């Protein structure tokens, strides 16, 4: 009921929280809910991007780091749910959010390890793709076609 609306028309989708636009929205929500100091307060809230949050976090901004903690933990928990029925060898992330590096990866792994069934702990690798986003999508589709 209180979940975020997603661009697909549903509510509560992972995309609404763990995408670049999701990070920007989390920033706006956290700025509105608290009076904690943050570099992000110097910006127009409606124009904040995930890049702004990343820059602030890299400058030691605690609120910006908390935004990535929230996002990464949520994505890590989703990976834990996915592992329960698929037992993947690896989770490979690509796209603009991966430029956040450890700001995102550390909380992803924490969220995963705190949420995943114990039999899956330490089994999956967590990697950032070195491919550009559009290349990854085309190559993934090609690989599926090749197997058919």
Specify the residue positions occupied by each region the protein language model found.
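ATP-binding/phosphotransfer module of carbohydrate and carboxylate kinases, centering on a glycine-rich
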Residues: 2-148
């Amino acid at each position: 009921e209180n979940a975020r609306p997603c661009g697909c028309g549903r509510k509560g989708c992972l995309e609404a929280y763990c995408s670049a636009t999701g990070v920007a929205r989390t920033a706006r929500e956290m700025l509105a809910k608290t009076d904690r100091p943050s570099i992000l307060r110097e910006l127009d809230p409606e124009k904040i991007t995930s890049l702004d949050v990343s820059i602030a976090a890299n400058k030691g901004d605690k609120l910006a780091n908390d935004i990535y903690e929230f996002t990464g933990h949520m994505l890590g928990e989703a990976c834990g749910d996915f592992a329960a029925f698929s037992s993947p060898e690896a989770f490979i992330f690509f796209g603009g959010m991966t430029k956040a590096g450890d700001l995102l990866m550390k909380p992803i792994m924490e969220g995963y390890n705190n949420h995943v069934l114990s039999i899956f702990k330490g089994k999956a690798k967590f990697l950032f793709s070195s491919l550009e986003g559009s290349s990854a999508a085309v190559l993934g589709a090609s690989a599926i076609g090749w197997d058919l």
